[in-house]
Amino acid sequence: MENVVIIDAVRTPMGRSKGGAFRQVRAEDLSAHLMREVLSRNPELNAAEIDDIYWGCVQQTLEQGFNIARNASLLAEIPHSVPAVTVNRLCGSSMQALHDGARAIMVGDAQVSLIGGVEHMGHVPMNHGVDFHPGMGRTVAKAAGMMGLTAEMLAKIHNISRQSQDEFAVRSHQRAYAATQADHFAKEIVATNGHDADGILKRFDFDEVIRPETNLAGLAALRPAFDPVNGTVTAGTSSALSDGASAMLIMSESRAKSLGLTPRARIRSMAVVGCDPSIMGYGPVPASQLALKRAGLKLEDIGLFELNEAFAAQSLACLKGLGLLESMDDKVNLNGGAIALGHPLGCSGARISTTLLNLMERRDVQFGLATMCIGLGQGIATIFERV
């Protein structure tokens, strides 16, 4: 079975969904921009040699509908002979795109895959047009479709206090801001056209969503967002709403060698699991455990972790379940996470994987694990090994 290696990994800046930098930029354009950029950065690869494009996107309607992967590839002027498919595993969509592209290479159905994902939550809100089947109420609690209430459930089950959630949110913003100031995101962010507050076209090369002024006093003043009577989860301890795209170029190790391209890492293992929809945020725990088992590794072998911060309560419950609370400041989300950067649903899986790869290189770490919770009760994880 072929080893699958990561050649390149990039993303757009994260734009604020409400009146932000990408308010006049379409999701297809964000995607096409990254596709073109990946190809221009790797001229050794002829675009016609891409076997397939896998692109994550959750709300596949309006500008994100009718197979946005293909629409974006056509906008990027990738040869018509290269196919493209849109992948939807909700929050884990672009990580699933990575898994699908990698698996095709592993079994010999492909040599090169371009993968990524996008979500423009300013143009297509998360709940746009959603109509749950009423019969689901027989087996699944209605609140399981309300992500904030699933976070409240985890907070209660795992005794996650309001104070610890607020502290985690402050940490996310502080770390993301520090990473920005130190240019630690520079290697992964591709400057992207947007509009400033006055509507003037400009190129953005920084994440617009980070709030460096976030502090415990300000967060403590916020009301619970989902359970107004007994809740502890607030807007400040939930992932920000943002717009963005991410992309990765992956190929077989043998193809990379023949093209003279230097791999950054290889995929050591992949895993997807299901869990109770009412505690969907706990999915990263069994997903990570399965990925470790498939990789033949132990938790202590992993030098760095990227956990998508859907909610502080959800993140802390997972870290507690994995036994990572004590090592969090040394190993987990060292550049902040979705509470500060936002969680453009279809983009996030490849985004956290890209951030993880850069951290692994900067800190000379051999193994890294990226994992995410998924709405309606799933978890997904990928273990990367530097080569």
UniProtKB/Swiss-Prot annotation:
Primary location: cytoplasm
GO cellular component, one term: cytoplasm
Active site: C91, H343, C373
Catalytic activity line of the entry: an acyl-CoA + acetyl-CoA = a 3-oxoacyl-CoA + CoA
Entry annotated with the keyword Chaperone: no
Top-rank EC class of the record's enzyme: transferase
Keyword terms: Acyltransferase, Cytoplasm, Fatty acid metabolism, Lipid degradation, Lipid metabolism, Transferase
GO molecular function, a single term: acetyl-CoA C-acyltransferase activity
GO BP of this protein: fatty acid beta-oxidation; phenylacetate catabolic process
The enzyme's E.C. designation: 2.3.1.16
UniProt subcellular location: Cytoplasm
Known pathway: Lipid metabolism; fatty acid beta-oxidation
Keyword Transferase belongs to the record: yes
Subunit structure: Heterotetramer of two alpha chains (FadB) and two beta chains (FadA).
Function of the molecule: Catalyzes the final step of fatty acid oxidation in which acetyl-CoA is released and the CoA ester of a fatty acid two carbons shorter is formed.
Name of this protein: 3-ketoacyl-CoA thiolase
Gene name of this polypeptide: fadA
